[in-house]
């Protein structure tokens, strides 16, 4: 059963990597101007991102407690205005949330692999598998919602669903593996994701039509109707 849960969560981590790669392709095809397509294809930021993802997919010989898959090129790529034309400013927050969720998943994989003997019951392992399977569709939904035209309300809803699924995975992993102290990084990661999510929520609210009091013209029309 321990092997099953390790494989299941390992597959989930692989799906995150594939989602990032798909996101690069989507952004390149959908956001780059046609006349700059060849230049975008050969641009260094994209090459660096794809290269980093391929390097990270290789098996690591590090200790399980040190297993972390992060992308140090993300910040530099987002600052490059020629890489993506995102006038809304929401794309970077979506990528940040995906990155945080991916990092959390990788570390949870390490903790699960290193806590096999501490597992409570086979039911606990089953819970981890069930929750983990719910995350990959959420990742796909977030990536699909990043296709233009961007809908802030859709981005808000789908990133919220993804973060809730990852938070649920954190809870069941903590319970199954008897994780207690030294886990401040989990709460810090979730807090950071919430900060990015708050930006998406504000954008979603701003995209809704005003429901305030009617202006002078509307007031005069109402009086005429009366």
Swiss-Prot record:
Coiled coil: none annotated. Keywords: Cell membrane, Endoplasmic reticulum, Membrane, Secreted, Transmembrane, Transmembrane helix. It is found in: Endoplasmic reticulum membrane; Cell membrane; Secreted; Secreted, Extracellular exosome. This is Transmembrane protein 98. Residues 207-226 are annotated as: Disordered. The keyword Kinase does not apply. GO terms for cellular component: endoplasmic reticulum; endoplasmic reticulum membrane; extracellular exosome; extracellular space; plasma membrane. Functions as a negative regulator of MYRF in oligodendrocyte differentiation and myelination. Interacts with the C-terminal of MYRF inhibiting MYRF self-cleavage and N-fragment nuclear translocation. The secreted form promotes differentiation of T helper 1 cells (Th1). Interacts (via N-terminal region) with MYRF; the interaction inhibits MYRF self-cleavage. Belongs to the TMEM98 family. One of its GO terms (biological process) is negative regulation of protein processing. Its main location: endoplasmic reticulum. It is a single-pass type II membrane protein. Residues 25-226 are extracellular. The chain crosses the membrane at residues 4-24.
């Amino acid at each position: 059963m321990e092997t099953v849960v390790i494989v299941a969560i390992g597959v989930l981590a692989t799906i995150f990597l594939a989602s990032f790669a798909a996101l690069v392709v989507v952004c390149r095809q959908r956001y780059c101007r046609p006349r700059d397509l060849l230049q975008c294809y050969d641009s260094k930021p994209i090459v660096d991102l794809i290269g980093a993802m391929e390097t990270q997919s290789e098996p690591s010989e590090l200790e399980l407690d040190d297993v972390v898959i992060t992308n140090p090129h993300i910040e530099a790529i987002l600052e490059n205005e020629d890489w993506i034309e995102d006038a809304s400013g929401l794309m970077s927050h979506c990528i940040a949330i995906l990155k945080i969720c991916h990092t959390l998943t990788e570390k949870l994989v390490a903790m699960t692999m290193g806590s096999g003997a501490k597992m409570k019951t086979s039911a606990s392992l089953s819970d981890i598998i069930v929750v983990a399977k719910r995350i990959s569709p959420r990742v796909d939904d977030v990536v699909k919602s990043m296709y233009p035209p961007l809908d802030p309300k859709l981005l808000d809803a789908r990133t919220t669903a993804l973060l809730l699924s990852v938070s649920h995975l954190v809870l069941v992993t903590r319970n199954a593996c008897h994780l207690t102290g030294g886990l401040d990084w989990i709460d810090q990661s979730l807090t950071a994701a919430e900060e990015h999510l708050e930006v998406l929520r504000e954008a979603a609210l701003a995209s809704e039509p005003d429901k305030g009091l009617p202006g002078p013209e509307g007031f005069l029309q109402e009086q005429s109707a009366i």
